[in-house]
């Protein structure tokens, strides 16, 4: 975990061994304009971006890592100290916050998956409002980026939720940056644009991607394209995780489900999240949502680095996400 306070200058790149003026120009134009971006790139990505050989790409990446101290081991005590810099954003449901260990964690990727109407998008809207609250109310006094792949973002809902929390609705709307994306390349570019906002000094503390996998499913339909789809999805998730860890930002993504073959039991055992192992291994927290009776939503924590698998309930009201009465 490495939180950056300030953006790296482009001059840092030019001082790396193996990076001449032409290579630097190619790297910068391809988006590799800082040491950390180069350090977190794969050898193949750098080879393609700068049109250089494998040995040169590896040398440049290792030099960037060395400059940033990424090749040094840390004690568990030091890691614990770094983790204490992370924060959490309330969902406005004490039940849901408790399930997640206090809310949506920064420097992590939280995935909510479930069928249509289970509440995934509503949670995303709620978080985009809640992140603006002061820390004593469960927020981070920050702004949100909302990457919308299915056209489900509604500013009217942001306004409604903000008013319920006594926030200035006009200010709340200005604190949410929305981008409607139309294909997977556009989606991946949106994540990089979000990083640019952060590097320019915007206090972005939350990035919502709703939905993470919809466009990938739409573009890569056949079995023959599955490997390509998973590779590209993996790169996108890697970008999101890098942003989360570098800038101490919370990433909230929604995901679709598909029926499990040979399953006849309704609920968790009858569906599985889209994205396969790529997403399963990348998500820090994974929550399955389903509808219960009388408007109740059931949330099950399926995966977490340190929390037990368990269930809780919440409701979606006019005011937003709340606990059942």
Swiss-Prot record:
GO terms for molecular function: ATP binding; ATP hydrolysis activity; ATP-dependent DNA damage sensor activity; damaged DNA binding. InterPro entries: AAA+_ATPase, DNA_recomb/repair_Rad51_C, DNA_recomb/repair_RadA, DNA_recomb/repair_RecA-like, DNA_repair_Rad51/TF_NusA_a-hlx, Hlx-hairpin-Hlx_DNA-bd_motif, P-loop_NTPase, RecA_ATP-bd. Pfam families: HHH_5, Rad51. PANTHER family: MEIOTIC RECOMBINATION PROTEIN DMC1_LIM15 HOMOLOG, RECA/RAD51/RADA DNA STRAND-PAIRING FAMILY MEMBER. Keywords: ATP-binding, DNA damage, DNA recombination, DNA-binding, Nucleotide-binding. Involved in DNA repair and in homologous recombination. Binds and assemble on single-stranded DNA to form a nucleoprotein filament. Hydrolyzes ATP in a ssDNA-dependent manner and promotes DNA strand exchange between homologous DNA molecules. Belongs to the eukaryotic RecA-like protein family. GO terms for biological process: DNA recombination; DNA repair. This is DNA repair and recombination protein RadA. ATP binds at residues 114-121.
